Amino acid sequence: MNNQFEGRSFLKEIDYTPTELAYLIDFASHLKTLKAHHIPHPYLQGKNIALLFEKTSTRTRSAFTVAANDLGANPEFLCKDDIQFGTKESVVDTAKVLGSMYDGIEFRGFKQSTVEDLATYSGVPVWNGLTDEWHPTQILADFLTLKEHFGHLKGLTLAYVGDGRNNMANSLLVAGAMLGINIAIGSPVALQPAPAVVALAQQYAQAAGSTVVITADPQQAVTQADALYTDVWVSMGEQVDYGERIKQLLPFQINTALLAATGKSSTIVMHCLPALHDLKTQLGAKLGEQYGMTAFEITDDVFQSKQEVVFEEAGNRMPAIKAVMAATLGNLFIPTSIFN
C-alpha cells in the first residue's frame, strides 16, 4: 500500500499516530506553498464532497469549500435545514445515502457520536469539521502556525486559558502532548478538562517527553509560554448564565498583564475565532451593556497587537483541511516507510 491515509476518516486526533499528524502538518505547508506559487494540485479531480453542517460556520465552511475547489473536487453544502438529517431520517440512513453519492463527507455539528456514525455507515472518508468534543482540523492549522513561527513543535510550551472542558481545550491538550508540546490548561476547577482526557494526554506526553499541567492559577499556567491560546467563554449551543461564566473566567482573560506574566517577549497569541475582543458584534454589544465590559476572553489591545497570529491561524485552516482531504482521498504516493 503506497498511502496509509487512503480511505481513512479523521474524526479526532488520536485516530492518527503522532508521526502521521506531523506529516499532515508538513503536507499542509507544502500545499500552501503550491497555492502561493499558483501551481495546480488537482489531486481530487472529479471527486464529490458533501459538506454537512449542523452548526453555522465562517472558517470551516470557507476552508473546506476553497480546499475542495483547489483540489479539483466538487463541494456541496448541506445544512441541517436542507435535508432530513436526524429529523425524518436517521444519521445511519443519511450516512448510507450520502456515501452512495459522495466520495467524502465533512461534518460540523454537536455530537461526536454523529460524526462517528457517519464514518461507520457511509463507507467513505469522513472529516470532523468540529464537534462538541474535538476540533482536529483546527489543531492542524494551529500547529502549522506554530511551526511557521518557531520552526519546530517539540519542546514548545503552549498555555490555553479559559473553559478547559471545550473541544479546543481537549484537542490542544491531547494533540499537543502527542507532538511533544508542553501543554498547560488554566481554568477554574469547575471548568477543567475531564479526567479521562487529561489521562490520555499524560500518556502521550510521557511517550513524547513533554509535560501536561492543569491549574486553576492563570499566572502559573502561562509561565514561560511560547503561545497563549484562548477561545470563547460560552460554546455554540451551550445554555449557561453568562454572568456566572464571566465571573468564573475573568481572571483567565488574555490581557496585557497575563501576556506579560509569560516572562517572554516572543510569546504569540492564538484564538480559533470568532472572538469577543470588542463590542462590534450584536452579541458583544449586548453583553457589554449588560455586564459593563468592553471585551471578554481577550482584550482588544492584545488582539490587535503584533503578537497575535489569529488571522494566520484562520488562513491556515484551508491548507490543513486540504492536506487531510488529499491524503485520505487523493490516491497519492505516500511511502509507508516514512512512518516507521
From Swiss-Prot:
InterPro entries: Asp/Orn_carbamoyltranf_P-bd, Asp/Orn_carbamoylTrfase, Asp/Orn_carbamoylTrfase_sf, Asp_carbamoyltransf_Asp/Orn-bd, Orn/put_carbamltrans, OTCase_ArgI
First-tier enzyme category under EC: transferase
Localization per Swiss-Prot or TrEMBL: Cytoplasm
Binding annotation for carbamoyl phosphate: S57, T58, R59, T60, Q84, R108, H135, P136, T137, Q138, C272, L273, R317
Organism encoding this protein: Lactiplantibacillus plantarum (strain ATCC BAA-793 / NCIMB 8826 / WCFS1)
Gene3D superfamilies, A to Z: Aspartate/ornithine carbamoyltransferase (3.40.50.1370)
This protein's encoding gene: argF
Keywords, sorted A to Z: Amino-acid biosynthesis, Arginine biosynthesis, Cytoplasm, Transferase
Keyword match Nucleotide-binding: no
GO biological process per UniProt: arginine biosynthetic process via ornithine; citrulline biosynthetic process; L-arginine biosynthetic process
Pathway: Amino-acid biosynthesis; L-arginine biosynthesis; L-arginine from L-ornithine and carbamoyl phosphate: step 1/3
Protein name from the UniProt record: Ornithine carbamoyltransferase
UniProt-listed Enzyme Commission number(s): 2.1.3.3
Reactions the enzyme catalyzes: carbamoyl phosphate + L-ornithine = L-citrulline + phosphate + H(+)
GO molecular function, one term: ornithine carbamoyltransferase activity
Binding-site residues, L-ornithine: N167, D231, S235, M236
